[in-house]
Amino acid sequence: SSTTHRLTENGVDVTGLHTDRSPTSLAVVSVSPDGERSFRFMRGADANLSPDEIDEGWVDRSKVLHFGSVSLTAGMSRSATIFAARRAHKTGKLVSYDPNYRPSLWRGREEAMQWLQIPLPLAGMVKMSREELPLLTGSEDLERGSEILEDMGIQLVVVTLGAQGAFYRWRGRTGQVPGKEIEAADTNGAGDTFLGALLYR
């Protein structure tokens, strides 16, 4: 397809790519005058990814497997995501997880908490927002919440704090990296950019 060709031209490896006749999923983000965001999702092709479409050899050849929680909101893609994460964990790859909680994708908070917590023992690195920490650990305290996650075997826990920067726990040590003062017009994609840069380092 033209999209696949464009990706390849720009250096994106499309090995393991599967196509589906369903439309592409859409996320519509509205930003209020005070900067608050609201999300509306229309799920499509990605929700149909099945475990059969996960190439174990592709997982085995990778260095990092990263996933977010949107794929955990639909039964088929949930199975595929957990299958891939288990395979990567078993073969010693770095499993990176972003439990990006979007209430409108779940039937309720209890369901979200159940499924958001399942991948945690498979992850070597987890990045979340301050609001997501209690969903995963039951604790709002950065030190205690990150310790709970470390006890599950997670080596690096990162909690983003908006303008205050980021808190981290790395192999028993904790710290905070301050944010830089800027005039933010739109923070969409900020967490993804932060995590991409962190994984690259």
Q: What does each model-found stretch correspond to?
A:
Residues 86-90, 138-201:
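Conserved phosphate-binding/catalytic region of the ribokinase-like
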Residues 70-148, 164-166:
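Conserved beta-alpha-beta core of the PfkB/ribokinase-like small-molecule kinase fold
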Residues 1-69:
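Conserved N-terminal subdomain of the carbohydrate kinase-like
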Residues 35, 99-101, 130, 161, ...:
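Generic detector of well-ordered alpha-helical packing
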Residues 5-9, 32-35, 112-116, 144-146, ...:
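Short, hinge-like loop/turn segments at secondary-structure boundaries
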Residues 54-55, 116, 145, 184:
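Acidic, amphipathic alpha-helical patches
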